[in-house]
From Swiss-Prot:
Residues 482-569 are annotated as: Disordered. The gene is POB3. Pfam families: PH1_SSRP1-like (PF21103), POB3_N (PF17292), Rttp106-like_middle (PF08512), SSrecog (PF03531). Belongs to the SSRP1 family. The lineage of its organism: Eukaryota, Fungi, Dikarya, Ascomycota, Pezizomycotina. SMART domains: Rtt106. It comes from Gibberella zeae (strain ATCC MYA-4620 / CBS 123657 / FGSC 9075 / NRRL 31084 / PH-1). It is found in: Nucleus; Chromosome. Component of the FACT complex, a general chromatin factor that acts to reorganize nucleosomes. The FACT complex is involved in multiple processes that require DNA as a template such as mRNA elongation, DNA replication and DNA repair. During transcription elongation the FACT complex acts as a histone chaperone that both destabilizes and restores nucleosomal structure. This is FACT complex subunit POB3. Residues 491-500 have a biased composition (Basic and acidic residues).
């Protein structure tokens, strides 16, 4: 046996690029073919080794002693097993154990927690292994369901690069990769049964029965070092209302990350993931909103949340002492944090995030204010109502869907009337067109009283503004003026023809002056029609007709004759 055993085309921790692997008595090393950092491991740090079939041939999985991490070397040939078994036995005093995977394709089996990974076994054969370093987060998705989120390729459990550095997640996996896995775990169990051989020595707690899914979740948090084990808590804020994602969460703030702990979901977020931080006063003058832009965003199943929106009462005070000594405050944070705070809650949370995350806090621009002397404009995106804020360098709509649009990415801003709406005269829409064909965003139902202030602010920021409302008003006014001119001309023409029209008369052959009206018969209670009543009434009518005839004969002398006296008696 030579002093060095070399193997080509070996992949370290699912790396995209192969490299050369060399084993020696002092340990082994791996170097990528294209050049880069070399990974080495001392022989004293090798706890165990396993040989099994893998994606690119056969792999050796090595468990480290110190960090309890997993190292995968993939790409060996089947005939390499004898050489490697001798290397591990003679140089590292370790047995290279050969294991076969379960290939039945069953999705039910037994989950076992070992020192470095979670193993899912089917009929006592491993179907797959999940190293704890690959787990980014876990949540109770239901009463009997646990969701496990994988660490992103850029960062591992401790936000450190993986691959040849092997301190976090596996090196740059392919474009399509597993991001979440869910386990359905019904029934109850004990901690000893859940953890198996690695269970603790506390016999009292081991024998206590508990919901199996909850126990699985708690064990995974402990094994993968998710949550409190990431370090000492610097500050904690309880029961903070979140508008996005909706719910109430406890905020635990650590040195490099913070954690949102809710009843159903928990999130662990690195401060490096915070790209934007804003403090926005709500137009109700009672609340403040704290908005954090995250990259990568939070995941809740298939839903992504690129922004976290918290809400605090304006007058809610808090007194808190940070879990840091004076030396740490001066050396690590350079007086960006204070040991004691006694201020409104939203200000304290914002200042601690600024100090720990080293992020600048943005606020609404001072050059814009609404007609109600507020910074937020009430509007909506489609059916979702919210508030639009004009910052110094961007638009920000909150709470849902939280939308951030930088002014430098804006091609034009268009004011338009609400088409076909009853409130068209009192509200308008804003359409923001993005550069390079990136689409557009529309903010609807904005009060008409804020139109001039918005137009002036956008022009101040150098944005291209198109006001279709004024253009429509001008066109409408011109059309109405034209219509009025046309109607005046028509009236004048009719006036010129009026005298000639009035001179023309025609005889209405159907008109009869001596005919009685049917209306009187229908509505006059004293009217009596022909052919009705007794004979006396007919006689009286005849006498009345005779009197009428006499009156007609004497009509010419009526003015000269004195009136006849009525007979009495």
């Amino acid at each position: 046996m030579t002093a060095i055993e070399s193997f080509d085309n070996i992949y370290l921790d699912l790396s995209k690029e192969s490299g050369k692997c060399r084993f020696a008595e002092t340990g082994f090393g791996w170097k990528p073919v294209g050049g880069g950092d070399t990974f080495t491991l001392d022989h004293n740090n090798i706890a165990s080794a396993q040989w099994s079939r893998a994606a690119k041939g056969y792999e050796i999985k090595i468990v480290q002693r110190s960090k309890s991490g997993i190292i995968q070397l993939d790409g060996f040939q089947q005939e390499d097993y004898d050489r490697l078994a001798k290397v591990f036995k003679n140089w590292y005093s370790t047995v290279l154990e050969s294991k076969e995977h379960a290939l039945r394709g069953w999705n039910w089996g037994k989950a076992e927690f070992s020192k470095s990974e979670l193993t899912f076994s089917v009929q006592n054969r491993p179907a797959f292994e999940l190293p704890y370093s690959e787990i980014g987060n876990t949540n109770l998705a239901g009463r009997n369901e646990v969701a496990v989120e994988m660490a992103l390729p850029e960062s591992g459990a401790n936000a450190q690069l993986g691959g040849a550095r092997s301190k976090g997640s596996k090196a740059a996996a392919g474009r399509d990769q597993l991001v979440e896995m869910r386990f359905y775990i019904p029934g109850v169990t004990t901690r000893k049964e859940a953890e198996g051989e690695d269970a603790g020595s506390d016999a009292g707690n081991d024998e206590q029965e508990k919901n199996a899914a909850t126990l699985f979740y708690e064990t995974l948090i402990d094994k993968a070092e998710i949550g409190e084990t990431a370090g000492d808590t610097i500050a904690t804020f309880l029961d903070v209302l979140h508008l996005t994602p909706r719910g109430r969460f406890d905020i635990d703030m650590y040195e490099a990350s913070f954690r949102l702990r809710g009843k159903t979901y928990d999130y662990k977020i690195q401060y490096e993931a915070i790209k934007k931080f804003m403090v926005l006063p709500k137009p109700d003058e009672v609340h403040y909103m704290l908005v954090m832009g995250l990259d990568p965003p939070l995941r809740q199943g298939q839903t992504r949340y690129p922004f976290v929106v918290m809400q605090f009462k304006k007058d809610e005070e808090v007194t808190i002492d940070l879990n840091l000594n004076e030396e740490e405050l001066k050396s690590k944070y350079q007086d960006k944090l204070e040991p004691h705070y006694e201020e409104p809650l939203h200000q304290v949370v914002a200042k601690i995030f600024r100090g720990l995350g080293n992020r600048k806090i943005s606020s609404p621009a001072k050059d814009f204010i609404t007609h109600r002397n507020q910074y937020g404009i009430k509007c909506s995106i489609k059916a979702s109502e919210g508030f639009l804020y004009c910052l110094e360098k961007a638009f920000m709509f909150v709470p849902k869907p939280a939308t951030y649009i930088a002014y430098e990415q804006t091609q034009s801003v268009t004011f338009s009337r609400v088409s076909g709406a009853v409130s068209a005269l009192s509200t308008f829409d804003i359409t923001v067109l993005l550069k390079n064909g990136a689409g557009s965003s529309q903010f609807s139902n904005i009060s008409r009283e804020d139109l001039k202030a918005l137009e002036s602010f956008f022009k101040l920021k150098g944005l291209r503004v198109k006001n279709e409302i004024d253009e429509d008003a001008n066109l409408l006014a011109a059309a109405m003026n034209q219509q009025m001119d046309d109607s005046e001309d028509e009236v004048a023409a009719k006036a010129d023809r009026g005298s000639a029209d009035e001179d023309e008369e025609s005889v209405d052959e159907d008109f009869r002056t001596d005919s009685e009206s049917d209306v009187a018969e229908e509505y006059d209670s004293a009217h009596e029609s022909d052919g009705s009543g007794s004979d006396e009434s007919n006689v009286d009518d005849d006498e009345q007709d005779d009197d009428d005839d006499d009156d007609d004969d004497d009509g010419e002398d009526e003015d000269e004759r004195p009136k006849k006296k009525k007979k009495t008696g």
